[in-house]
């Protein structure tokens, strides 16, 4: 059932048919005994209603499935205490890894100490220089520059930048890039509004 060893295709088909007839499903706990880890990846995001985060989770689920992993998804509801609780809860599953979009700019150091050797990847709302694990981010400063440059090319003189939160590193960098681009142009009035 693991697909890790070659099995005669006819025999594999017969075994799968018998398993289906008997209602057999893989015992995840038993499978975990050999590796010490479940073939589960935990994804923790601040808000499942956020369009970007929803799309991110959907794509990560598809990639995990292609690689033979199941996914547990959880929302921290933009609350650091809930984020910590969710991370501690998924550690009980002994996941193969954790992907986290933190509520703020990092993951609490004491929580990282509890993770042990479980691989973790921080995505989006994270300042890469504040953590000792892999991160996936974009150049937020450059994004802000490019946005204002594009609007200036379209003839805009007044730009309103609507942001969700001022306390997130990625948002601060986008605002800084937009402000620098507006200042460099000299004829752009940039207003930043938190919504």
What are these regions (language model features)?
Residues 1-39:
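N-terminal helix-turn-helix DNA-binding module of bacterial transcription factors
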Residues 77-78, 96, 100-146:
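Flexible loop/hinge segments that line or gate small-molecule binding clefts
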Residues 91-102, 158-163:
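Periplasmic-binding protein-like
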Residues 64-75, 160-162, 178-195:
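Short beta-strand elements in bilobed, periplasmic/extracellular small-molecule ligand-binding domains
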Residues 81-94:
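Short, well-structured alpha-helical segments in soluble
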Residues 134-161, 183:
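Hydrophobic alpha-helical segments within soluble ligand-binding/sensing domains
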């Amino acid at each position: 059932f693991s697909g890790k060893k070659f099995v005669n295709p006819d025999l594999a088909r017969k075994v799968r048919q018998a398993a289906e007839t008997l209602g057999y499903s893989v015992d995840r706990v038993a499978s975990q005994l050999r590796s010490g880890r479940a073939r589960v990846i935990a994804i923790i995001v601040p808000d499942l209603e956020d369009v970007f985060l929803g799309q991110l989770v959907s794509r990560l689920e598809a990639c995990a499935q292609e690689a033979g992993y199941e996914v547990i998804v959880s929302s921290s509801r933009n609350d650091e205490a809930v984020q910590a609780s969710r991370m501690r809860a998924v550690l009980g599953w002994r996941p193969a890894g954790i992907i986290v979009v933190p509520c703020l700019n990092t993951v609490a150091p004491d929580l990282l100490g509890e993770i042990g050797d479980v691989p973790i990847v921080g995505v989006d709302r994270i300042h890469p220089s504040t953590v000792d694990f892999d991160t996936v981010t974009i150049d937020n400063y450059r994004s802000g520059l490019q946005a204002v440059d594009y609007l200036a090319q379209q003839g805009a003189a007044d730009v309103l930048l609507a942001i969700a939160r001022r306390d997130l590193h990625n948002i601060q960098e986008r605002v800084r890039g937009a402000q620098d681009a507006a200042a460099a142009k000299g004829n752009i009035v940039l207003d930043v509004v938190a919504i």
